[in-house]
Amino acid sequence: MAQTHSFNGRKRVRKFFGKIPEVAEMPNLIEVQKASYDQFLMVEEPSGGRPDEGLQAVFKSVFPIQDFSGASMLEFVRYEFDPPKFDVDECRQRDLTYSAPLKVTLRLIVFDIDEDTGAKSIKDIKEQDVYMGDMPLMTDNGTFIVNGTERVIVSQMHRSPGVFFDHDKGKTHSSGKLLFAARVIPYRGSWLDIEFDSKDIVYARIDRRRKLPATTLLMALGMDGEEILSTFYKTVTYTRDGDNWRIPYSAERFKGMKIISDLVDADTGEAVLEAGKKLTARAAKQLAEKGLKAIKATEDDLFGSYLAEDVVNYATGEIYLEAGDEIDEKVLKTLIDTGETEINVLDIDHVNIGAYIRNTLAVDKNESRQEALFDIYRVMRPGEPPTMDSAEAMFHSLFFDSERYDLSAVGRVKMNMRLDLDAEDTVRVLRKEDILAVVKMLVELRDGRGEIDDIDNLGNRRVRSVGELMENQYRVGLLRMERAIKERMSSIEIDTVMPQDLINAKPAAAAVREFFGSSQLSQFMDQTNPLSEITHKRRLSALGPGGLTRERAGFEVRDVHPTHYGRICPIETPEGPNIGLINSLATFARVNKYGFIESPYRKVVDGKVTNDVVYLSAMEEAKHSVAQANVELDEQGGFVDEFVICRHAGEVMMAPRENVDLMDVSPKQLVSVAAALIPFLENDDANRALMGSNMQRQAVPLVRAEAPFVGTGMEPIVARDSGAAIAARRGGIVDQVDATRIVIRATEELDPSKSGVDIYRLQKFQRSNQSTCINQRPLVRVGDRIHKGDIIADGPSTDLGDLALGRNVLVAFMPWNGYNYEDSILLSEKIVSDDVFTSIHIEEFEVAARDTKLGPEEITRDIPNVSEEALKNLDEAGIVYIGAEVHPGDILVGKITPKGESPMTPEEKLLRAIFGEKASDVRDTSMRMPPGTYGTVVEVRVFNRHGVEKDERAMAIEREEIERLAKDRDDEQAILDRNVYGRLADMIDGKVAAAGPKGFKKGTTITRELMTEYPRSQWWQFAVEDEKLQGELEALRSQYDDSKKLLEARFMDKVEKVQRGDEMPPGVMKMVKVFVAVKRKIQPGDKMAGRHGNKGVVSRILPVEDMPFLEDGTHADIVLNPLGVPSRMNVGQILETHLGWACAGMGKKIGELLDVYRKTANIEPLRQTLEHIYPDNDRNEPVRSYDDDAILMLANQVKRGVSIATPVFDGAVEADINAMLTDAGLATSGQSTLYDGRTGEPFDRQVTMGYIYMLKLHHLVDDKIHARSIGPYSLVTQQPLGGKAQFGGQRFGEMEVWALEAYGAAYTLQEMLTVKSDDVAGRTKVYEAIVRGDDTFEAGIPESFNVLVKEMRSLGLNVELDDTREAEQPALPDAAE
């Protein structure tokens, strides 16, 4: 094969162990957020106008608004967004919200109403754009910037609207009888419950109020008793036949009955079946075929039946008997007396069909619609006297008014499916048919037909994403606004006003602000590393408004459900009280338009698996048999085995291959992103896998990221979708690169309206929400060719476009002197000195100068009573220099605050006389470094209020910023010039000129040489004879001028923003932010973890020479306890270790071959080895077609270790690991002889050694360690505060007191409870005594005792402490006297 393929070295090449081909593309991982919010905002208006969803739907549902008299109406026309005032970075820096102004076009229509006829005619129409507040915009990475911090709106899982049938599992009644209930849940509006009680009467409840008989509800819908019965029951007609009665025979009704008395044919009089026999379905059918039409019935058969219709004397209109009355002797006599020959009774046999509705009707005391409506009114509004109108209006507004009640499209679809109805999904209110169908279904359930619903099924739970949450919130704001508008329309002279005067947008804007600022679902983004960002955006929470609460959620809700397969990850969920309530979306899952989670499947047609992918929700999937992704297939895509393991309706079973109609897309569609990053997940216990998924999110980005040797193939996807690594927006050639930006001249997708230049600004040492460091580094060089989607810069925790959360370290599994007891970790000093686990954290310190009552605070270098030494890092404005090394207690920003006058001591008077005013009236309130923090100042930002004079430092920062903007503008201008003049030269080269610059002869042919004689700006003066070309030249010219103007306008706008003052909180004159970078090396007490839930704390850092070493002298980097593996059952870490060992072995081998090449220039052995490592298949890089440069580049990349990918559930197996170990020339046991670093003796046994990927977690000892001698005290109790943030003390609690009591250490105990805590006078005395060098003191009364006394006095109990000293007590009489 021709060696043509070049390799740019900008991506990590992995050897793939997966055997299953990837058919479906994994959807973008933050699609959930972006798609939802885009659908809500619909910033660009489509050509046919916006569809009724999202923001448009909200406006449509609230408008038009009419005033109370109907004389005027405010209509909604359309909305649009203005461009945002500040871009994302400016909002981050200035603590603003990234948002765009929303303009709504409203139309006010005023009517003339004819007083006599009441007819309306339009008098006046006014249209106007009204500003309706700012709408937060989503950044490209799916986050929001609110007051300068990045936030994420987490999607919420809630119960889908619709109808649900359930029973109480026998818990309500002591007999354990199942009481069935149905509940209609709308998207918004009143809930309707229909339930059985223990006596089998059907009741209805509205909004969980007092229960009413269900028939009351049906009567309120306009039905009467007879109609209700005929709806729920069939009738049987008894016809008088001499002394007896005859009833029609139907096989359906009699099958399965046991005959009590002989079954007699009414026509012939012969017995067709003797008593005591059971009538089987077959026998019943045979009787009908033989011609049995009717059978004889006695009066006894009639007793206990119920009348199906009223018995009325038509002459007088008197009702003798009502429908539903039970037939007994008296009733039957009445019937015969009235001369009835046919009696219709209800078909109730108390076995298949129960008399529940009939009994409910009998208990119901309401007889008419009016009574029923009044009854419902009394339940809903107790204490108000009902009138027919008010009751009717109230009942209508409960379920039938689209303003108050909304099932939503989802609710209607679910209801149609459950009840077999066919209403349009635009019918969003309940109908009479719906309520009847619900009651019918409930009665059928009670009769033993049908199934109850499982509310934890994902077909019954849906996801509310950002867009929908925001839509609901905005609707609330608009409804608040609506009330105000109505009042205003009625109160002012409507003829003279404009829409603007009616609208106060505050409530709408406040609703939005409240949602982003304080909703439970609006969360501070977890930005520790790129994975934690992605996971946070893909999180599904069952908590939040309208959801569950931790306390109420039982086991069932939290449990894994069969429908979670491929939709919600069964592994990733927090440990602790939220377990199972907060979940993560599976890798391939997406949310459909109804809010249900869908998973992709491959279609199986005629037993062959196709590559057609369909997305199905849980409801749709239940109808199919789905085979797993790892089923064996033959060449043609048919199933190899006769029977295939598949899932059907939540059960796993073996099905014949003909019955299988779908197949999973990929084995990793089962798990979430974090779990899909764990290699050998299939070999780990689920509990540990859960910890592994959760701890990867806490890994701190290290100074040098390194991708894992043993990956899963998910790493590049996470790095790209999280936005940590920068991918090229379009292809082109790299024009300029430095540490802060990459400039690319586009060659693909050139659009005349856009500039031909892409400038990518890299983030340098930005602080993340968790104080970790966000820093991006370019991967490209000037002149490189780039294609769309190529990774051009690495971000935090990424390495060549792969996610890299930790480092590969050489591990030995062995005990070492007890230093790895209880999961502790022993590290080599080499790890510290090589900065393997060193991370940079950026702390932000903020100081504000306010205007106080006594005068303004001042930021200055001139601070009273501070030595020159302490000011050495400050500039003349009193702000620390960039690059200064700062220590605890150092001043970062000097600030003085005026203090009130206090009486002066003679010394102060003297000072004032000598030094003048200044010294006395201010106090030092400078911003100092907190204890225990060392670092380097990396950035300073100064913010000034409008109109406040800027200091030197602010001016310098401003100049720098403007220079940077100018450089950007100039670069873009230069590339634009080069492009445009290049195109111009190409267009006129060799053409005949019709005109030209001064001194140019007309009719001459234009050549490049000729053009060089004139400056470029004069080339535009050339005109050509070809008119079409001349038109193109003019178009190019105008496009060039527009681009220049746009560039300049953009530049001026940015400069103006930099120069103008900043919005400040009230009372703040000036604010300074100082960013300090802290370098944290790993040290004892830091928490580390692998990817398999194997976590531990660093216990000791050992000199390299003491660490165990291999025969070749290589020392282990880290020693882990082998006992951490068996009981935890996370064997994945051992397999990873072996495979990592093989990777490093192969890398070493390649390194040796590289050295051979350098000596002999023979590349063949190297090429062969690499081709052997990366066999030719779809998943691996085409190494066979690499040219020599590419081979060398690849060899240099892998000489530290070959990177491999072992996808979850489809990864390397033991044979693969053994083969790789053998290739690398290592023992297949994966064990080596180790020598003790201290003695040089070999250890008794061989030790498992290899490379494992370790992470340093965010629980760093530097953030936790804390000490205090004196510090702040609580105001009331006067005890020291608690916690590091408050610089508090260590609590000597109840149990510690018991310990001292047990020792009898009385004086120590007294000290603890008094002078070391809250004896105010005592502690000052002790301090003075220590200063004097004296060690005697006396304890006084603790302040908490006084608090107790005051508390008792406030309850009215006077308690006084009699402080009588022993000295004043009379001496006891002497015993001798």
Swiss-Prot record:
The keyword Transcription applies. The keyword Iron-sulfur does not apply. GO terms for biological process: DNA-templated transcription. It is an enzyme of class 2 (transferase). It catalyses: RNA(n) + a ribonucleoside 5'-triphosphate = RNA(n+1) + diphosphate. Its EC number is 2.7.7.6. Keywords: DNA-directed RNA polymerase, Nucleotidyltransferase, Transcription, Transferase. GO terms for cellular component: DNA-directed RNA polymerase complex. PROSITE patterns: RNA_POL_BETA (PS01166). CDD domains: RNA_pol_B_RPB2 (cd00653). GO terms for molecular function: DNA binding; DNA-directed RNA polymerase activity; ribonucleoside binding. NCBIfam families: PRK00405.1, rpoB. Belongs to the RNA polymerase beta chain family. DNA-dependent RNA polymerase catalyzes the transcription of DNA into RNA using the four ribonucleoside triphosphates as substrates. PANTHER family: DNA-DIRECTED RNA POLYMERASE I SUBUNIT 2. The RNAP catalytic core consists of 2 alpha, 1 beta, 1 beta' and 1 omega subunit. When a sigma factor is associated with the core the holoenzyme is formed, which can initiate transcription. This is DNA-directed RNA polymerase subunit beta. It comes from Brucella suis biovar 1 (strain 1330).
